[in-house]
Amino acid sequence: MPELTHFNTAGDAHMVDVGGKPSTTRMAVAEGYIAMLPETLRLIMAGGHEKGDVLGIARIAGIMGAKRTADLIPLCHPIPITHVDLALEPQPEASRIRCRTTVQTVGQTGVEMEALTATQIALLTIYDMCKAVDRGMSIESVRLLEKIGGKSGHWQRASGEARSSTR
């Protein structure tokens, strides 16, 4: 089993030194869902929510979340993000919205945490904007789908795989 990199030999938490690593192009894709009542999804899709464009605001919030990841997760490096693509896809047949986020950088460490954070923040924003009409919404299956770049190269979740034990 690989070692946890955020602990030193004494077992203390530390920020990993990436200074000696070469800058390379890196990309990560994450997804997650928010399940809700069919009426809530219809309200969002019709654009009739009194607070405004739920999906548009959630998209901007997710992008902001990607940019603020290092402020939220203590041992994350602040990195120069070169691109964030966040898509929100209503899925009426499942009464949910899928969020898929792609984040890119050219740097010394990956953008997995930025993609996961952006996804979570977008979904949390939908929850916040709609909780007055549906407190039973559920954020589900937030996970990394793919990462490219760095020492570990290319990793992609197998189709239908809920959990991965590989790097």
UniProtKB/Swiss-Prot annotation:
HAMAP family reported for this sequence: MoaC_B (MF_01224_B)
Family named by the database record: Belongs to the MoaC family.
SUPFAM superfamilies the UniProt entry points to: Molybdenum cofactor biosynthesis protein C, MoaC
Reaction equation(s) it catalyzes: (8S)-3',8-cyclo-7,8-dihydroguanosine 5'-triphosphate = cyclic pyranopterin phosphate + diphosphate
UniProt gene name: moaC
Biochemical pathway: Cofactor biosynthesis; molybdopterin biosynthesis
Protein name: Cyclic pyranopterin monophosphate synthase
Superkingdom of origin: Bacteria
Assembly and binders: Homohexamer; trimer of dimers.
Keywords assigned by UniProt, alphabetized: Lyase, Molybdenum cofactor biosynthesis
Alphabetized InterPro entries for the sequence: MoaC, MoaC_bact/euk, MoaC_sf, MoCo_biosynth_MoaA/MoaC, Mopterin_CF_biosynth-C_dom
Keyword set includes Cytoplasm: no
Function: Catalyzes the conversion of (8S)-3',8-cyclo-7,8-dihydroguanosine 5'-triphosphate to cyclic pyranopterin monophosphate (cPMP).
EC number per UniProt: 4.6.1.17
Pfam families in the cross-refs: MoaC (PF01967)
Residue numbers binding substrate: L75, C76, H77, M113, E114
Molecular function GO terms recorded: cyclic pyranopterin monophosphate synthase activity
Catalytic machinery residues: D128
Listed GO biological process terms: Mo-molybdopterin cofactor biosynthetic process
